[in-house]
Amino acid sequence: MDAQCSAKVNARKRRKEAPGPNGATEEDGVPSKVQRCAVGLRQPAPFSDEIEVDFSKPYVRVTMEEASRGTPCERPVRVYADGIFDLFHSGHARALMQAKNLFPNTYLIVGVCSDELTHNFKGFTVMNENERYDAVQHCRYVDEVVRNAPWTLTPEFLAEHRIDFVAHDDIPYSSAGSDDVYKHIKEAGMFAPTQRTEGISTSDIITRIVRDYDVYARRNLQRGYTAKELNVSFINEKKYHLQERVDKVKKKVKDVEEKSKEFVQKVEEKSIDLIQKWEEKSREFIGSFLEMFGPEGALKHMLKEGKGRMLQAISPKQSPSSSPTRERSPSPSFRWPFSGKTSPPCSPANLSRHKAAAYDISEDEED
């Protein structure tokens, strides 16, 4: 422990004395950025048969308690995770991430089974073994890849790769002649469980492709793949081309329908606006008409005023009588104002005309 503490102190001193980007150190008041050594993030993980291992050095497996507490930098905990990794997806990456983070100092070794083993024990794969090796190599959490990994882990394989723990989800993985291929690993105390990611798996991806096979076949035919490459018969090829043309016609009809709906909607909006404006103008017109020609309109008042003025002009006002009980005696003759002479007597014809005019004036007054 003392040696480990002294190594940490020396490492801190080296970090402080390390020059910064401009040649300055932390002691000069300018914090320096130490570049991390992240080979796994810059290059693909190496294959196990390309790494030279010094088997002369003794190897002692660490316990779970020691691994959880932390190990020295030169002695990482070697964790092994295996699988098929066909159509490498986020579920695979999450499982490897969990295996990498099981302990503070972990060296993750990933085994990938060959095509022969996989086809015999599990079934046909979409990707061949080289494609699957390459996919796992480029996962950021992987430190080493084992090609042609065994289906069942043997003590010799564990010793050869100096494996401390095996990481896998704790669901029993059955195989030919065994209910759980990790049973002996669990009994030896070397099993480190991880959690399976729900909703994503290679089988689910293949199911989606099979379910929508016609869609993907038509898409690849459009992109230049031949019917022979897609293993599509002549009749199905013509059917897919016909469906594609029908879909194009449907799309055009749908576009026209949408545009016509938009046009009709705009026309309706415009018509509603015009109707509203027409109603407003009609109300204004009716109101103006009633104000002018209605029962109490301005025209009737004008006619009444004109009629009254005409009546005043035609018949002047009579002077009040001297006595209300005394009746005025008809004058025998008409006298011109400002003259002392009496007018001559009226002829019978003139007298009848005067009576008729007086009768008309009296009728107008009664009206």
From Swiss-Prot:
Positions of modified residues (N6-acetyllysine): K8
Q: Which residues get modified to Phosphothreonine?
A: T325, T342
- Which stretches of sequence are listed as region Disordered? 1-33, 313-367
Q: Where is the composition biased (Low complexity)?
A: 319-339
Is Cell membrane among the key words of this record? no
Task: Provide the catalytic activity annotation.
Answer: phosphocholine + CTP + H(+) = CDP-choline + diphosphate
Pfam families from the UniProt entry: CTP_transf_like
Notes on how activity is controlled = Interconverts between an inactive cytosolic form and an active membrane-bound form. Activation involves disruption of an inhibitory interaction between helices at the base of the active site and the autoinhibitory (AI) region. Activated by anionic lipid vesicles and by oleic acid or diacylglycerol-containing phosphatidylcholine vesicles.
Q: Which GO terms describe its biological process?
A: B cell proliferation; CDP-choline pathway; isotype switching; phosphatidylcholine biosynthetic process
Q: Which CDD domains match?
A: CCT (cd02174)
UniProt KW keywords: Acetylation, Cone-rod dystrophy, Congenital generalized lipodystrophy, Cytoplasm, Diabetes mellitus, Disease variant, Dwarfism, Endoplasmic reticulum, Lipid biosynthesis, Lipid metabolism, Membrane, Nucleotidyltransferase, Nucleus, Phospholipid biosynthesis, Phospholipid metabolism, Phosphoprotein, Repeat, Transferase, Ubl conjugation
Q: Where, subcellularly, is it found?
A: Cytoplasm, Cytosol; Membrane; Endoplasmic reticulum membrane; Nucleus
Q: Where are the annotated coiled coils located? A: none
Pathway it belongs to? Phospholipid metabolism; phosphatidylcholine biosynthesis; phosphatidylcholine from phosphocholine: step 1/2
List residues binding CTP.
I84, F85, H92, K122, H168, D169, Y173, Q195, R196, T197, I200
Record note on what altering P150A does: In SMDCRD; decreased function in phosphatidylcholine synthesis shown in transfected cells; severely decreased solubility
Q: What is its main location?
A: cytoplasm
Q: In which tissues is it expressed?
A: Brain, placenta, liver, fetal and adult lung.
Q: According to the UniProt record, what happens if one changes R223S?
A: In SMDCRD; no effect on solubility; decreased lipid vesicle-dependent choline-phosphate cytidylyltransferase activity; 4-fold decreased Vmax; 3.5-fold decreased affinity for phosphocholine; 3-fold decreased affinity for CTP
Amino acids binding phosphocholine:
K122, W151
Q: Where are the sequence repeats?
A: 319-324, 329-333, 343-348
Subunit architecture: Homodimer.
Q: What clinical condition is it connected to?
A: Spondylometaphyseal dysplasia with cone-rod dystrophy: An autosomal recessive disorder characterized by postnatal growth deficiency resulting in profound short stature, rhizomelia with bowing of the lower extremities, platyspondyly with anterior vertebral protrusions, progressive metaphyseal irregularity and cupping with shortened tubular bones, and early-onset progressive visual impairment associated with a pigmentary maculopathy and electroretinographic evidence of cone-rod dysfunction. Lipodystrophy, congenital generalized, 5: A form of congenital generalized lipodystrophy, a metabolic disorder characterized by a near complete absence of adipose tissue, extreme insulin resistance, hypertriglyceridemia, hepatic steatosis and diabetes mellitus. CGL5 is an autosomal recessive form with onset in early childhood. Affected individuals also have short stature.
User: What is this protein identified as?
Assistant: Choline-phosphate cytidylyltransferase A
What is the species of this protein? Homo sapiens
